[in-house]
Amino acid sequence: TSDKSTECYRNWWPGPGDDMVALMNRSIDLMESHAKDSDNVFLLNRRGYLFATANPEMADKFALQASEAESLGAGPLRHITNGALYRPASAHGFENGLDGADLITDKDIINVHFPYINPEAVAVLHARRCGSLSAQQMGMYLLERTRENGGELFSAELIGVETSAGRVTSVVLEAAGDVIEIRTDNIVLSTGPYMKVCAALLGIDLPVAVEKHIKISLSDPYRAIPREAPLIFWAD
């Protein structure tokens, strides 16, 4: 959802199947196209996701996860044994970013490039086609483009979907106490935690569940974590 979003994106997904990787690769292609067209008004970057561990067994799991991701289409795995071969992510922008992932198991290389993480780390996995953006800015940009092309924003509650022969024929909305039916052949459900409820209006029982996430913000007056750092996960 975008309500309390971390405003990050990734093509780094496990199987089974390549559905999520393929979906996100296509979505990232579209975001990058919009970023180019808008002079990157929504600040898309590709700093990556960084997974770190102090557990040698987890380092082996990193390698397996990266190999699986490569097989699913997330890009190649590069095992960095020479620090000169590691290419740090750009702090801004996305056009020169790598895909795939870099696995580093040399502590000296880790300390050079990521001096701000736990010095006990024995491995880091830097997934590359990942990053962050201003989701609100992107939303406003897309809304403006939609209006330029004749689209309208209409605020209402979806209370029903009419179908015939297995196809959508109209949507039923409620706004300010009025019930409105709009005929349409298509409906796009982008309802986040309400996806299962909305799909039920179509007679579809989606196998999805709402998972609670808790976000905590901590002040960093000493700038222990650089502003240009990747999104960091301590895997232990």
Residues covered by each model-derived region:
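Alpha-helical scaffold segments in soluble metabolic enzymes
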Residues: 30, 64, 141, 148, ...
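Flavin-dependent oxidoreductases
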Residues: 10, 20-22, 26, 161-236
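Dinucleotide-binding Rossmann-like beta1-alpha1 core, especially the glycine-rich loop
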Residues: 7-109, 113
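Short amphipathic alpha-helical/adjacent loop interface patches that line ligand
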Residues: 6, 27-28, 146, 195
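Short hydrophobic/aromatic beta-strand or adjacent loop that forms the aromatic wall/cage
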Residues: 49, 122-124, 211-215
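Helical element adjacent to the flavin cofactor pocket in flavoenzyme catalytic cores
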Residues: 118-120, 124-186, 190, 194
